[in-house]
């Protein structure tokens, strides 16, 4: 009598296993909407988690989107957030529908077509794996985040993304290992623009003796010290006292460079162009679109609707938005000349430690200092919009930081170069080839100074916030996540994006460990 239940139980397990296999096979097909890595069939179409969530929110909120251009905006992984109207129209055109959640059995023709597409994608992946380079031996200890950061075969392919222009090759002068190439030159870069002269000088012997100095200047002017440019520390009372230590400022010492070969002015100018181009290609929203939307504010009723949402729903929404922003930062890093030449361990260390900091800096582009609002899900809203998160102090601190940065009147190129230096930081713990990171960081410092010198904006250096402020905001975010994770562990495990959990989530602590 027990045979029938056993047979039924075995059949159920086989069906479940077959369903999982079928789903995993479908996931090799990219999202039909934006081309990102898909996670299965959602609302009747193979899509990624981002497009699934976007379609769900558009149906729940019943929002009427509008297009500011010709209603034919390209929708791919990098541009999908630029026009919500065209993204929704593409979802509908490809067949996404709430009625398609349970669409019944596929016809044989549909199954055969799906199977053929799966096989095609698998063959392409096998070909890519055959031509892919073997990762450096020093990178094997960093495999845990390789998939979710997209530095292998995960969400963002190792090579150039299919929907973004390929990053151009890096000049050899920016990447040579120490001990190779031409000898040092005392004059590292010299530029004369519109009557202004900026002479950057470096002596390796002096550099060894001097040690690393701060690069901030009280008057913001480039001044020659004993070993080149020197800047004194600047304090910002409105942001709190900067922390002391080897990692206390946004940009490390400019004066004492690592022992690296000569980098020509041509190389430095190329690096400026590369960083700025990489930034433009990996911005979620164009600046002109953000400025155009500034008058599009959430109504009082819409703000109230957000405030009435459950804490877990708002956390899930923000986790998905933050993860998407971090994916753009990953693409930015991969396009920076020299980054992909670092060992994989160091790539992951830099991204893990710096991606959130870059997102916080980038946020100033979407912040309107006139009314203290930020662009979120299609409109501008203030701190009250995020009340349901239950972390008003953190949200206020992030808004204050964006307000401080917006007062600096960053140009797009200045944000690009600044965020590159926030990301490429040789003081991150765990680096295996620190000298190579120092080399890249030093050249980025040169590039930043060179650009500021050309645009007569050297005074900006004295106004940059202390690095301790960025670290403090990131630490507050992790602390609030730990509290939320303790209250809603299942939500974090089941609904939060894998990349977000890899970067920020920890084991659930006891209530005693979550003191205010």
UniProtKB/Swiss-Prot annotation:
The keyword Zinc-finger applies. Residues 119-133 have a biased composition (Low complexity). PROSITE patterns: NR_LBD, NUCLEAR_REC_DBD_1, NUCLEAR_REC_DBD_2. GO terms for molecular function: DNA-binding transcription factor activity; DNA-binding transcription factor activity, RNA polymerase II-specific; nuclear receptor activity; sequence-specific DNA binding; transcription coactivator binding; zinc ion binding. Pfam families: Hormone_recep (PF00104), zf-C4 (PF00105). GO terms for cellular component: external side of plasma membrane; nucleoplasm; nucleus. Expressed in immature Vgamma2 gamma-delta T-cells (at protein level). Expressed in the liver. Expressed in the heart. Expressed in the kidney, jejunum, and brown adipose tissue. InterPro entries: NHR-like_dom_sf (IPR035500), NR_DBD_ROR (IPR044101), Nucl_hrmn_rcpt_lig-bd (IPR000536), Nuclear_hrmn_rcpt (IPR001723), ROR_rcpt (IPR003079), Znf_hrmn_rcpt (IPR001628), Znf_NHR/GATA (IPR013088). SUPFAM superfamilies: Glucocorticoid receptor-like (DNA-binding domain), Nuclear receptor ligand-binding domain. Residues 31-96 bind DNA. A motif (AF-2) lies at residues 499-504. Residues 109-118 have a biased composition (Basic and acidic residues). Changing residue 31 to A: Loss of adipogenesis inhibition. Induction: Isoform 1 expression oscillates diurnally in peripheral tissues such as liver, brown adipose tissue (BAT), kidney and small intestines. Isoform 2 is induced upon antigen receptor ligation in the presence of IL6 and TGB1 (via STAT3). Induced by TGFB1 in T-cells. Changing residue 502 to Q: Loss of transactivation function. One of its GO terms (biological process) is mucosa-associated lymphoid tissue development. Residues 104-145 are annotated as: Disordered. It is found in: Nucleus. SMART domains: HOLI (SM00430), ZnF_C4 (SM00399). Disruption phenotype: Mice show decreased adipocytes size and highly insulin sensitivity, leading to an improved control of circulating fatty acids. Mutants are protected from hyperglycemia and insulin resistance in the state of obesity. Loss of circadian pattern of some clock genes expression in the peripheral tissues and massive apoptosis of thymocytes. Knockout mice for isoform 2 lack all lymph nodes and Peyer's patches, as well as LTi cells. They also show a reduction of T(H)17 cells in the lamina propria by at least 10-fold to less than 1% of the T(H) cells. Nuclear receptor that binds DNA as a monomer to ROR response elements (RORE) containing a single core motif half-site 5'-AGGTCA-3' preceded by a short A-T-rich sequence. Key regulator of cellular differentiation, immunity, peripheral circadian rhythm as well as lipid, steroid, xenobiotics and glucose metabolism. Considered to have intrinsic transcriptional activity, have some natural ligands like oxysterols that act as agonists (25-hydroxycholesterol) or inverse agonists (7-oxygenated sterols), enhancing or repressing the transcriptional activity, respectively. The AF-2 (activation function-2) motif is required for recruiting coregulators containing LXXLL motifs such as NCOA1 and NCOA2. Interacts (via AF-2 motif) with the coactivators NCOA1, NCOA2 and PPARGC1A (via LXXLL motif). Interacts with the corepressor NCOR1. Interacts with CRY1. Interacts (via AF-2 motif) with PROX1. Interacts with FOXP3. Interacts with NR0B2. This is Nuclear receptor ROR-gamma.
